[in-house]
A protein has these predicted regions:
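Generic N-terminal targeting/processing segments that precede catalytic cores or assembly contacts
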Residues: 1-36, 64-68
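Internal alpha/beta core interface subdomains
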Residues: 27, 31-156, 160, 167
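Short acidic, glycine/serine/threonine-rich loops at helix termini
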Residues: 58-63, 90-92, 178-182, 187-189, ...
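Acidic catalytic cores of enzymes that act on phosphate-bearing nucleotides/polynucleotides
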Residues: 146-193, 201
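A conserved active-site cap/scaffold subdomain adjacent to cofactor or substrate pockets
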Residues: 181-253
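Short active-site loop/helix that positions an aromatic residue
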Residues: 261-270
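Internal helical hairpin/lid segments
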Residues: 274-288
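Single conserved hydrophobic/aromatic residue that forms the stacking wall/gate
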Residues: 290-300
Length: 300
């Protein structure tokens, strides 16, 4: 979930930019899992921005606690602490990888943060308070493992661009989950559109070449939120099974529906796409009739 897919290709360098929020436990597990499968993962072919913010245990506890309180009105978050981590980033109290290089500074920052977080955990969510010493020790252990990967990635990327090297920016999630242009509030906590590749890496947008969008030949969604073309019948269930449509993080079944050309047109406009890669067309071969939702407004 954290490491770019390019790590599977020999001779390629993968970079996780400053715009990502990273769970140190998960990324350590990912690196170990890749190594176990025979892939070489070192600081030479994987680089992590020192400015990337860390998802910490209290972020996940708060994330899950909020969903429980909301009950049937829950957004359907993965519970990985992504939203609360971005909140701390915006409120200027987040912890970044660069903070791990000085244990004293890290502890001072966490001391201030935990004053607030522990009150929220105990008074609002009835959870145990987090020990600062335990948290600091755990983070320092992770830092020891990850230290070789943590660098100034914006400098590395810009030097690579200026040297004429080719770079593929790989985004995550869909346009309709964008914090501004998606189906708010049923969205993720960050920008998912193509222009975020610049602010999320530090590479000037004018240096970019073409913008390529990727879409399935049908629509899917995990969790709650509007889905006008959803197939709420046996055909939709069959499409889910045939297309193996289950959430990559939680394993939750994805809701399936017909391709929504209105949403697709919106995505093309917002991202300024030059071309689209259409995937899973073969999955639709199981159906005798295929529907699409097309724009009907005069402006379309």
């Amino acid at each position: 979930h954290h490491i770019p897919s390019g790590v599977l290709r020999n001779g390629k360098i993968s970079v996780i930019g400053n715009g990502a929020v990273i769970d140190p436990d998960i990324i350590v597990d990912e690196i170990k899992a890749l190594r176990k499968k025979g892939y070489k993962v070192t600081g030479k072919n994987l680089k992590i921005s020192e400015l990337a913010h860390l998802i910490l245990p209290f972020h996940k506890l708060i994330d899950i606690g909020r969903e429980i309180i909301k009950g049937k009105n829950a957004i359907g978050t993965t519970g990985r602490g992504i939203g609360p981590c971005y909140e701390d980033k915006i409120s200027r109290q987040g912890i970044r990888f660069v903070d791990l290089s000085n244990k004293k500074i890290l502890k001072d920052k966490l001391k201030m943060t935990l004053k607030e977080k522990n009150k929220i955990l105990s008074l609002v969510f009835n959870q145990k308070k987090i020990s600062i010493n335990t948290l600091v020790d755990d983070l320092m252990k992770r830092f020891k493992f990850l230290k070789e990967f943590i660098v100034n990635t914006e400098d590395f990327l810009n030097k690579s661009v200026n040297q004429g090297k080719s770079i593929l920016f790989e985004g995550a999630q869909g346009v309709m989950l964008d914090i501004d242009f998606g189906t708010y509030p049923f969205v993720t906590s960050s920008s998912t559109i193509s222009s975020n590749a610049s602010s999320g890496t530090g590479v000037p947008y004018k240096k970019f070449g073409k913008s390529i969008g990727i879409s399935k030949a049908y629509a899917t969604r995990v969790g709650h939120g509007p889905f006008p073309t959803e197939m709420i019948d046996d055909e939709g269930l069959a499409l889910r099974e045939f297309g193996d449509e289950y959430g990559a993080t939680t394993g939750r079944p994805r809701r399936c529906g017909w391709l929504d050309l209105i949403a697709l047109k919106h995505s093309v406009e917002i991202c300024g796409l030059d071309e689209i890669i259409l995937t899973k067309v073969d999955i639709l071969s199981m159906l005798s009739l295929i529907h699409i939702s097309e724009p009907t407004r005069p402006s379309s």
